[in-house]
Amino acid sequence: MMTGTTLILEPVMDSKDELVKQHAKVAEDAVAGWEKAENEVVELKQKLEDAADKNIVLEDRVSHLDGALKECVRQLRQFRDEQEKNIQAAVTESTKELHSANTGLEKRVLELQKEAEAAKSENMMLRREFLTQREDLEIVMIERDLSTQAAETASKQHLDIIKKLAKLEAECRKLRILAKTSSSLSSNQSVDSHSDGGRERVEGSCSDSWASSAFISELDQIKNEKGGNRSLQGTTSSTEIDLMDDFLEMERLVALPTETQAKNSKDGYELSLMEKLEKIQAEKDDLEREVKCCREAEKRLSLEIEAVVGDKMELEDMLKRVEAEKAELKTSFDVLKDKYQESRVCFQEVDTKLEKLQAEKDELDSEVICCKEAEKRFSLELEAVVGDKIEMEDELEKMEAEKAELKISFDVIKDQYQESRVCFQEVEMKLEAMKRELKLANESKTQAESRVTRMEAEVRKERIVSDGLKEKCETFEEELRREIEEKTMIKREKVEPKIKQEDIATAAGKFADCQKTIASLGKQLQSLATLEEFLIDTASIPGSARSVHNKEALLGKDPHECIKTINGRSLEFLAIQNSNNKTSPPCSSSSDSTTVSLIMSSNRGSSEKNRNGFATVFTRSRNSVNLGI
C-alpha cells in the first residue's frame, strides 16, 4: 500500500517540483522585467530632474549672461570712444612729426645728392687726370727702356771697336817689323821717322784706348740705370761697318805672301799704311766724339729719368690722396644712404603703426558686432531651452502614461502567460507521471508490501522500546529528585566546600543528561505516533497499483494535499530521529536505540542519476530502518 502510494506520488512530486521551478523562473523573469521597468522609470525621473536642474541653471546662466553682456556692451562702447579719441590724437601727432621729419629728410637728401654729384664730377676729373698722367708715365717708361737699350748697344759697339783697334795696332806692329827687315838703310831712316811719328800716334791712340776702356767700364757700371738715345743706333752701325771693312782689308794685306810685298814698292806701301792709319785715327776721333755725345745723352737721360721718377712719385701721392678722398666720399655716401634708409624705415614703421591702429579699430568694431550676435544667439538659445523644457515635460507625461499602460498590459500578459504555461506544464507532467508510474508500478509492488510488513514489525519493536524508555525516564526522574533532595540536605548540613562543589557538578551533569534523555524520549514518542498515523493513512488508501483506472482516479483527486501531508509527516519524522540520534544519552545502550531516517535526493529531476527521476530503496539494518527516496 505504502509503496504504491509512493510510486504514484513521486512523479507527481517531481512534476510539481519542475512546475515550481518553472514558475519560480517565470516569476524571477517577471520580477527582473518589473525591476528593469522600475529602473527605467527611475532613470527617466532622474533625467527629468536633471533636465529641470539644467533648465534652472541655464535660466540663471542666461540672466547672468544677459547682465554681463549689457555690462560688456557698455564697457565696449566706452572703450571704443576712448580708443577712437586716442587714435585720433596719436594720428594727428604722428602725422605732424612725420611731416616735419619728412621735410627735414627731403632737404638733407637733396643736399646729399648735390654733394654726391659734386664728388662724382670731381672724382671723374681726378680719374681723367690720373689716366692722362698714367699714359704719360707709360710713355716715359717706354722711352727710358729704349734709351737703356741704346746705351747698352752703344757700349757693346764701343767695346768691339776698342778690341778691333787693339788688333789693328798689333797688325801694324807686325807690318812695321816686316818693313824694317826688308827696307834699306835710307828707307829705314825715313821709315823710322815715320814710325816714330806713328808710334807717337799709336801711343796717343793707346792712351785714348785706355781712356775708352775706362769709359766702357763706367758704362758697364751704369748699365742698369735708365736713359738712352735713339739717334745713336744709325751712326754706331755705320761706323761698325766701316771698321769691319778696314779690318778685313788689313787681314787681307797681312795674308798676302811676303814675296808680293817685296815686289810692291816700299813707298807706296808705306803711304797706304799711313793713309790707313790716318783713317783709323780719324775714326777713333769720331768714336771719341760719339762717346762724349753718348755720355752727354746719358747724363741728360738720367736727369730726365729722375724728373720722370719724381713726377711718378708726385702722381702716386696725388693718386693716393684722390683714392683717400674717394673713400671718404664713399663712406659719407654710405652714411647718407644708411640715414636715408633709416628715415625710410621710420616712415614704414609709422605706416605700420597706423595700419595696426586701424586694424585694432576694425577688431574692436568686429568685437562689438560679435557681442551683438552673441546676445542674439543667447536669446535664441534661451528660447530653444525653454521650448526643449516644455517638450521634455510633455514627453515625460506621455512616457508616464505609456508606462502605466505598459504596466497594465504587462501584468495581463504575465498572468495569461503564467496560466497557459502552468496548464501546459501540468498536462506534460501528468503524461510523464502516468508513463513513469505504469513502468514502476509492477516493479515496486512486491517490494513495497514486504517492506511495509517489516516496518510494521519494527514499529511494534519500537513501541516496546519506547515503553522501556519511559520506565527509564521515570527512574531517572526519581533519581534526580533524590539527588536534588540530597543536595539540599548537603547544603543544610554545610559539608566541606570541595565535596560540595564536586557533588554539585556531578548532579548538574546528571541533571542535564536526564533532561536530554527526557527530551529525546519525548521526541521518539512523537515520531512513533507520527509513524503510526502515517501507516494508518497509507493503509486506508486503496491499492491503486493493481489497476490503471484506480491510479487515474487517485491522480484525479487533489494530489497536492497528499504530497503535503506525506512530506510534512516524513520531514517531521526525519527531524525527530536526527535530533534523537544527536541527543541520545550516554547511559542508554546502542542496542536499545532505533533510528528511522528519510534521505531525499536534491537533484530529483536530473537525468544523470535516473532516467525516470525516481529511485525508491528500502534498507533494513539490525537496529534501524532507513527509507530512501
Swiss-Prot record:
Gene Ontology cellular component terms for the protein in this record: cytoplasmic vesicle
Tissue expression per record: Accumulates in preferentially xylem cells.
Segments for region (Disordered): 186-205
Keywords, in A-Z order: Coiled coil
InterPro entries: FPP_plant (IPR008587)
Biased composition (Basic and acidic residues): 193-203
GO biological-process terms attached to the record: regulation of exocyst localization
Family: Belongs to the FPP family.
Job description of the protein: Ensures, when in complex with FPP3/VETH1 and COG2, the correct secondary cell wall (SCW) deposition pattern by recruiting exocyst components to cortical microtubules in xylem cells during secondary cell wall deposition by recruiting EXO70A1.
Protein name: Filament-like plant protein 2
Organism whose genome encodes this protein: Arabidopsis thaliana (Mouse-ear cress)
Gene coding for it: FPP2
